[in-house]
């Protein structure tokens, strides 16, 4: 027992002798640490060494102020720190001045190493990530510079230098929303003047009202967003964008370079692109923009396909010259042949030649509340006639009832989240329709839809690898007319796309599943593969999945549908876009090829 007991007593005695010294030891590096940051204790530092360290730091500051960079580097070397009894990297002020002196001498690697040591010793000192950002910027490592500046701002979010530096980096990447996020923290940018060059052929009062900010004010991020939303809603400019120019006085000029949409009446090439882009599928698009220089737009569609005849026209304009409010009138007439042999399950024999004639007209209004919120509402009157359709279930007759219907529609669209420095946004939408078919035994019906749209641009600049995810769902209460049913499929008159389920067969609509309830997810990711002054080609994969059902069982997809493939988008002269789809239905293995065009 004694041979174990004696060593334990000896160990306890040694611990008692050592403990008081450890508890009261204070290092010179703790006294030198900036902003009260704690530094590692060094039990080897004696009082005379602490005094010597303070004297050395004062000498270093004098030498730095007088521009003697090499002498500062010599006095702050790791060897000099060891001579003072300081652990390497523990004296953060020594590391700071060493890094600054090396930077003055353009010895970037040594400067970065010194700042890294200082950052490790004093993680709450904003000087180190700020200076590291400066080195990264000079070496054109802009991503690293942004990361370091965000690190500095996590320590002090109000630091004027770091905010201005980071905002400038985002502005150089043409990411003005992100730049404003940081400039606004320090009361910048103050707008001296708004320049519109060249002046567009648009009523100056309408253009003036489109800007939510004015000279002499600080451009806030929310005002830029509102202005962009209003300029887009005018419908007369292609991709409107505002840029800032810094002035020697510290202010900024806001520059807007309008790029007018080219409808009919422009150059011959513009006329051809506008009017004839749909000729491959027997369609023309006569469009006129900015009529009477008052942001009045007329859009129309003429289709002579014998299975999908259609004439549609719409007129929109600012309400009383106020671009925040816009009204629209529309008229749409169509005569279509439908093949429902694989999508309508209540017929005694396949319905492969149903004809639908419909005329629809109405009016609506849109209001832009701000850059994050807008809403719409309208009223439509429609009439329809069905031919060559039959059914077993009497309940199915309600879908194919001839007659007129009155529908009220409303919707709201909001920016739910935005992280401009990450180039990420999340938008939400909600819409509803309330209608009544004026026919015997018909009851009111309602439809509701909701959706989320997430967009992410992973590159700091440009649109390479733009990723989009869209989630939508809809439901119907009551029995809506057949022409108001939801359709999941790729078809030019439909926007609920499953890109390997083509909505027509031998030219007739009806091959895509229909119903009163649906869920749909679309994802795609695009890479620019070719670009010149005339065109831009983007290619990327897509993935779609969804399901559509009907309470009666007369329509629906029966199971979840899953599609994947490639999509090619070719944008010509910044306007008309050609879209080509190569899709595969993962349920059946069927392949799909489809092409269409889109306007501005």
Predicted regions and their residues:
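Compositionally biased, proline/threonine/alanine/serine-rich low-complexity intrinsically disordered stretches
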Residues: 21-55, 62, 66, 84
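C-terminal outer-membrane beta-barrel translocator/porin domains of Gram-negative envelope proteins
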Residues: 405-537, 541-542, 549, 592-599
């Amino acid at each position: 027992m004694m041979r174990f007991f004696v060593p334990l007593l000896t160990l306890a005695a040694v611990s008692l002798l050592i403990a008081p010294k450890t508890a009261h030891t204070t290092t010179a590096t703790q006294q030198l640490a900036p902003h009260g940051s704690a530094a590692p204790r060094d039990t080897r530092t004696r009082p005379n060494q602490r005094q010597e360290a303070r004297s050395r730091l004062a000498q270093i500051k004098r030498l730095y102020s007088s521009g003697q960079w090499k002498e500062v580097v010599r006095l702050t070397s790791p060897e000099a720190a060891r001579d003072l009894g300081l652990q390497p990297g523990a004296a953060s002020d020594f590391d700071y001045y060493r890094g600054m002196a090396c930077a003055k001498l353009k010895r970037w690697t040594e400067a970065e190493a010194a700042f890294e040591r200082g950052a490790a010793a004093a993680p709450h000192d904003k000087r180190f990530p700020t200076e590291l950002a400066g080195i990264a910027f000079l070496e054109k490592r802009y991503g690293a510079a942004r990361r370091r500046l965000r690190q500095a701002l996590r320590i002090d979010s109000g630091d004027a230098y770091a905010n201005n530096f980071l905002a400038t980096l985002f502005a150089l990447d043409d990411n003005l929303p992100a730049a404003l996020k940081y400039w606004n923290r320090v009361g910048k940018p103050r707008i001296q003047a708004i320049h519109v060059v060249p002046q567009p052929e648009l009523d100056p009062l309408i253009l003036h009202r489109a800007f939510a900010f004015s000279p002499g004010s600080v451009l806030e991020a929310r005002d830029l967003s509102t202005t962009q939303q209003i300029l887009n809603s005018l419908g007369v400019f292609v991709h409107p964008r505002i840029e800032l120019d810094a002035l020697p006085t510290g202010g900024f000029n806001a520059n807007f370079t309008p790029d007018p949409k080219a409808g009919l009446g422009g150059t011959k090439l513009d006329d051809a692109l506008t009017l004839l882009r749909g000729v491959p599928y027997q369609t023309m698009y006569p469009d006129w923009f900015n009529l009477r220089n008052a942001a009045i737009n007329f859009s129309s569609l003429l289709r002579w396909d014998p299975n999908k005849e259609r004439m549609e026209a719409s007129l929109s304009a600012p309400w009383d010259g106020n671009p925040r409010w816009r009204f629209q009138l529309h008229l749409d007439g169509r005569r279509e042949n439908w093949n429902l042999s694989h999508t309508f399950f209540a017929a005694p024999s396949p319905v492969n030649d149903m004809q639908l004639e419909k005329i629809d007209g109405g009016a609506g209004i849109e209001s832009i509340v701000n850059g994050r919120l807008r809403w719409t509402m309208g009223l439509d009157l429609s009439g329809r006639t069905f031919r060559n359709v039959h059914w077993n279930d009497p309940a199915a007759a309600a879908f194919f009832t001839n007659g007129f219907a009155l529908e009220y529609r409303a919707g709201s669209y909001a920016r739910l989240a935005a992280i401009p420095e990450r180039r990420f946004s999340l938008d939400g939408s909600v819409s509803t329709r309330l209608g009544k078919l004026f026919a015997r035994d018909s009851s009111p019906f309602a439809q509701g839809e909701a959706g989320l749209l997430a967009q992410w641009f992973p590159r700091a600049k440009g649109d390479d690898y733009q990723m989009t995810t869209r989630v939508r769902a809809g439901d119907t209460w009551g029995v809506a007319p057949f022409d108001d049913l939801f359709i999941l499929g790729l078809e030019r008159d439909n926007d609920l796309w499953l890109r390997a389920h083509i909505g027509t067969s031998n030219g007739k609509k009806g091959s895509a599943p229909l119903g009163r309830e649906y869920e749909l997810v679309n994802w795609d990711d695009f890479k620019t593969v070719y670009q010149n002054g005339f065109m831009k080609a983007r290619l990327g994969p897509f993935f779609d999945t969804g399901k559509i059902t009907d309470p009666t069982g007369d329509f629906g997809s029966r199971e979840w549908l899953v599609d994947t493939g490639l999509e090619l988008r070719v944008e010509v002269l910044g306007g008309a876009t050609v879209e080509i789809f190569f899709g595969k239905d993962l349920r059946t293995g069927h392949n799909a090829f489809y092409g269409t065009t889109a306007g501005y």
